[in-house]
Regions:
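Extended, low-complexity cationic-aromatic segments
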Residues: 1-51, 147, 152
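RNase H-like polynucleotidyl transferase catalytic core
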Residues: 6-15, 83-103, 119
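Mobile genetic element proteins and their domesticated derivatives, centered on retroelements
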Residues: 24-25, 31, 50, 68, ...
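Structural signal for conserved beta-strand scaffold positions within catalytic alpha/beta enzyme cores
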Residues: 35-37, 93, 115
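Short, basic/hydrophobic alpha-helical segments
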Residues: 45-64
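Acidic/histidine-rich, metal-coordinating catalytic segments
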Residues: 61-74, 102
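Short, aromatic/basic amphipathic alpha-helical patches
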Residues: 75-85
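C-terminal anion-handling pockets and recognition modules
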Residues: 90, 104-153
């Protein structure tokens, strides 16, 4: 391709928007990422993710959730769901417009680079599969695709 020309990327289904959303949490203790794929980014999907974390992944013990100020994090339904686990959960609200303070935001950047950047996929399912593969590699201690977080704070 000559300099100044724009590459044309074919679209399989022009004019149709397809979305999948990832909810994720980084566990400082075991250096792993817990995640769930959702069709919608809303209070109900986030509550399902909280239940996955607190019931399936960490049924006992206490956890700290660092959360930003996205609207569904502070919805009445989410706050009510969190109140059911108030004896085990400490919510740490991050200041507005400070994604650099949230470790999972660093991981999302890493994930996008490995799973999506400069890659043409044939379907949304292929994009999700690519993302899930990179996510699974984060939880494999021997994988070279892992993003390591410094714990020398």
């Amino acid at each position: 391709m000559k300099q100044g020309q724009q590459k044309i990327i074919p679209a399989l289904h022009p004019g149709t928007k397809q979305h999948r959303h990832l909810f994720g949490a980084y566990c400082w203790n075991d250096d792993q990422v817990r995640w769930r794929v959702a069709g919608w980014k809303n209070s109900q999907s986030f509550i399902e993710f909280i239940e996955y974390l607190l019931v399936d992944q960490y049924p006992t013990g206490r956890i700290v959730l660092a959360m930003d100020n996205v609207s569904y994090h502070k919805s009445a339904a989410v706050l009510a769901a969190l109140s059911l686990f108030e004896h085990r959960v400490l919510v740490f609200w991050l200041p507005p417009y400070c994604p650099e303070l949230n470790l999972i935001e660093r991981y999302w950047k890493h994930l996008k680079q490995l799973a999506c950047a400069n890659k043409l996929r044939n379907s949304i399912e292929e994009v999700v599969a690519s993302a899930e593969y990179v996510l699974s590699q984060q939880n494999d201690l021997k994988s070279k695709l892992r993003l390591t977080f410094s714990k020398d704070l």
